[in-house]
Each structure stands twice: as structure tokens, then as C-alpha cells.
Amino acid sequence: MNIENKCDLAFEVTYHPLYRAAQFWTFIFSTLAVPALFIFLLKQIFPLPFHGNIKFMLISYFLSAFLFAVVLALTFGYHILVPLFITSKCDLIIQPYLFKVGQLSLTLFITLQMIMPFGFSIERIIALRMAKSYENVRTVLGPLLIFVLIGIDLILLFTVFRDESFNDSFISFILIPATTAQTFNSYCWILLYAELGNLLCNCIILLVHSKFKTKFLHQQRSLSVRYELEEISQTSKFTLIVSFTHILFIGWYLGVTIFIRTVGETFFGSYINYTVARGVYISVPTYNLTIVFVGIKALSFMNLKRQNNVQSKVQIKSTGSEGARNYENAIASYWNSVSKA
């Protein structure tokens, strides 16, 4: 395709109603997701009472979502604004260097979001196996898993793009170059299978933990053990909610992407329609905003449930020798506080 035809294609695709509407959708949702994710990180994720390992991983996951939303807002802001100031059709062609930076940044952050939930499953399995002593484990596993997963993602992306020169004419930051499309398609298949497998693994962890918790509490009745098992249960439920919401949106994106690439141009009737279908990118930006509300709702429900459990189950005896000791401790605590005041 010569440069004139590419300029015509860029013009036809850019001003296609569906494509244009999708660009506005992505830009608006990504722009809203940036402050929402930032506040969610500061107000909800950083103060979590979870173990340091899973807390570090959750912070890393939502931080990558935040950075991804920032890059989406910038790149799709470009797509929204540039068509308003062009003087020729060829002005819609993205400069190779700018495309390379935008494309690699978007691909890196979306694949990080896809690969990090595997670390949740690994950490939860280890936490379950070490339930008796996990509260005393140092925060090493979480950072180690994150660094390993980031390294794996970088290696895989290098494999995908190592032969890409980025010298073609590009009209969208999210359209994978033709020379890399087949390799990236295979990577999408791997990620889709892995996402489904990870979701199944999370469900199994919850089922095993439920049975393990019931059996274990009959043998160990100390408050510290009960607290640790409850903490593992709560964190596992929260990571499952995040993983399920993730697979709902990201899995849909992967499935649709694979479908479009598989059926090809013939299914859509023309190359323009095929390019528009590949360029519609709304499920992932929608997820970046939706996960904030899902996370807030899940944490609020878990906190309310935990408070109700504490109020209904935690009691201090007031009769017998144990009651007398509790009374003496309460009086001593009161007079100590008065003397300090």
C-alpha cells in the first residue's frame, strides 16, 4: 500500500463513526480512571491490613493500572485532538518514533496487568501452606514475585517485537504492526489460556481454604491462629474478586482480539471495517475505571463483615477466676492511663 492509499485509509478510519466514538469513550474513561485509581491507591490499598507480601503485589498491580490509564489518556488524547487541526490526510499518520513509544508503553502495561494476577495465586498458595506462621514471614515473596513476573513479561515482549523496525505508516497506537501481528496473536492465546487457568486456580484456593479452615480450627483455637486464617480468607476473597473482574474485561478483550484476527478482512467486508474493528478499544479502559468501584465495594463489604464478626464472637468473660483477672486488668489499665494523664 503506497503512502497516498495509507493517508486515505487513515482518513477513512479516523472519521468512521464507530471508531471515533470508541476513541472518545477510551479517552473519557481513561481520564476519569487516572484520579480514581490514584485516590484508590492512597485511600484504600496502602492502608490495607493485609500481609506485606500480598499488599505489595496489590499496590504493584493497581500502580500498573494507574500508569496504564495515564498512557491511555495521553495516547487517545492525541487521537482526539490531532484530527481537529490537520491540514491534510497524511497528518493523521503517526510519526514512527512517537508510535514506537506509545505502542510499547501500552503493550507493556496491559500485559503487566494480565500477568501480575498469577503472583496472587502463587502467594495465596504459600500463605495457605504456612498458615500457622505466615504472619511472621518477612515481606520478601511479594516483591520477588513481582520482579520475576515483570522480567518474564519484558522477555516475552522482547521476543514479540525484536524484529520490528517500526518504519511503516501507523494510524493508531493500539494497532500491532503487520510484521509482528502473528507473534502477538500467539502471545494473546497464551495469555487467554493463562488467565482462565489462573481464575480456576483462585476458585480452588478458596474451596481448599474453606475446608482447611474448618478442620484446622478444631485443632488450633488460639486467637492468633484464628486471626491469621481469617486474614488469609479475606485477602484470598479480595484477590479473587479482582481476578474475576479482570478476566471479565481483559478476557473479553483478548477473546475479541483473537476472533477479529482469526476471521480477518473477509468477515468484515472491507479493509476499512476490519481496521476499525481492530482499533475499537473500550473494554480495557472501562475496566481501569470499573475496578475502582468494584474494589471499594468489596473492601467495604469485607470490613463490615469483619466488624460484625468481632462484635458477635469476641467476648471477655466476667465470671469466675478468669473474669476476676479480666476485671483487675481493666482496672489497672484505667489507673495507668489516669496516672499518665
From Swiss-Prot:
The transmembrane segments are 22-42, 66-86, 102-122, 141-161, 188-208, 240-260, 279-299
Q: Where in the cell is it found?
A: Membrane
Q: How does it sit in the membrane?
A: Multi-pass membrane protein
Please name every pair of cysteines joined by a disulfide bond in this record.
Answer: none
Look up keyword Membrane and say if it applies: yes
The record's section on PANTHER family has: SERPENTINE RECEPTOR CLASS BETA-1-RELATED (PTHR31216:SF12), SERPENTINE RECEPTOR CLASS BETA-1-RELATED-RELATED (PTHR31216)
Q: Under which name does UniProt file this protein?
A: Serpentine receptor class beta-1
**What gene is this protein translated from?**
srb-1
